[in-house]
C-alpha cells in the first residue's frame, strides 16, 4: 500500500515522503490517526497545496518542543524513595513516577515520552532522556534520595559564620 506521510513517523519517514507499507499498518494505524493519506494522483496534487500548512505546523511543534526541552534541562527532580539496608531501594523509580514528579513541577509530559532503558534501582543522580518531538530529545537529571534524607537534598545546608565574641 502506497501512502503519503502527513507527519513525521518514527522509523518510517518524514512529512511528504511516499512510502510503501503493509496494508494492515496503513489501514489500522496511519490512516485513522491522520498520519498518512493514500498516494493517488489527486491526493498528490492536494497534498502539495496542503504541504506548506503542514510544514508550518510541524515547525511550530518543533519550536515548542525545543522551548520545553530547555525548561526540562534546567529542572532537577528529587525523588524520595524508601530504602532498606545498605541503601537498597524498595521497588524502583519508573517512568510513571518521573512523569508525576515532572507534573508537580509544572511540566506535563506523557510518561510514554520518557525514555528509560531500565527502571532506576539505585540512589544517586541519573540522566533520563525525554523525547518531546522526533527531532528533539531533552535530558533530565533525576536525583533519587532516601526518604529520610529528603530535607537534606531539597535544601542545601548553609553553615553560619562563627560568631566572634563582642568586646
From Swiss-Prot:
Q: Which NCBIfam families match?
A: L9
Family that this chain belongs to: Belongs to the bacterial ribosomal protein bL9 family.
Q: Which InterPro entries match?
A: Ribosomal_bL9 (IPR000244), Ribosomal_bL9/RNase_H1_N (IPR009027), Ribosomal_bL9_bac/chp (IPR020594), Ribosomal_bL9_C (IPR020069), Ribosomal_bL9_C_sf (IPR036791), Ribosomal_bL9_N (IPR020070), Ribosomal_bL9_N_sf (IPR036935)
Q: Which GO terms describe its biological process?
A: translation
Q: Which gene encodes it?
A: rplI
Q: Which domain of life is it from?
A: Bacteria
Question: What SUPFAM superfamilies does this protein map onto?
Answer: L9 N-domain-like, Ribosomal protein L9 C-domain
What is this protein called in UniProt?
Large ribosomal subunit protein bL9
Provide the function of this protein.
Binds to the 23S rRNA.
UniProt keyword terms in alphabetical order: Ribonucleoprotein, Ribosomal protein, RNA-binding, rRNA-binding
Where does this protein come from, organism-wise? Answer: Nitratidesulfovibrio vulgaris (strain DSM 19637 / Miyazaki F)
Classification from the root reads: Bacteria, Pseudomonadati, Thermodesulfobacteriota, Desulfovibrionia, Desulfovibrionales
Gene3D superfamilies attached to this UniProt entry = Ribosomal protein L9, C-terminal domain (3.10.430.100), Ribosomal protein L9, N-terminal domain (3.40.5.10)
- PANTHER family documented for this protein: 50S RIBOSOMAL PROTEIN L9
Amino acid at each position: 500500500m502506497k501512502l503519503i506521510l502527513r507527519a513525521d513517523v518514527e522509523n518510517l519517514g518524514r512529512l511528504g515522503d511516499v512510502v510503501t507499507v503493509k496494508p494492515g499498518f496503513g489501514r489500522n494505524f496511519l490512516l485513522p490517526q491522520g498520519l498518512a493519506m493514500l498516494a493517488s494522483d489527486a491526493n498528490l496534487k492536494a497534498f502539495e497545496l496542503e504541504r506548506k500548512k503542514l510544514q508550518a505546523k510541524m515547525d511550530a511543534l518543533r519550536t515548542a518542543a525545543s522551548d520545553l526541552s530547555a525548561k526540562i534541562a534546567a529542572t532537577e527532580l528529587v525523588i524520595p524513595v524508601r530504602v532498606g539496608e545498605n541503601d537498597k531501594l524498595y521497588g524502583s523509580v519508573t517512568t510513571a513516577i518521573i512523569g508525576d514528579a515532572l507534573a508537580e513541577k509544572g511540566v506535563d509530559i506523557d510518561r510514554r515520552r520518557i525514555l528509560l532503558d531500565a527502571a532506576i534501582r539505585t540512589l544517586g543522580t541519573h540522566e533520563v532522556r525525554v523525547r518531546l518531538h522526533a527531532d528533539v530529545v531533552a535530558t533530565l537529571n533525576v536525583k533519587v534520595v532516601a526518604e529520610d534524607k529528603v530535607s537534606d537534598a531539597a535544601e542545601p545546608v548553609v553553615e553560619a559564620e562563627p560568631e566572634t565574641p563582642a568586646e
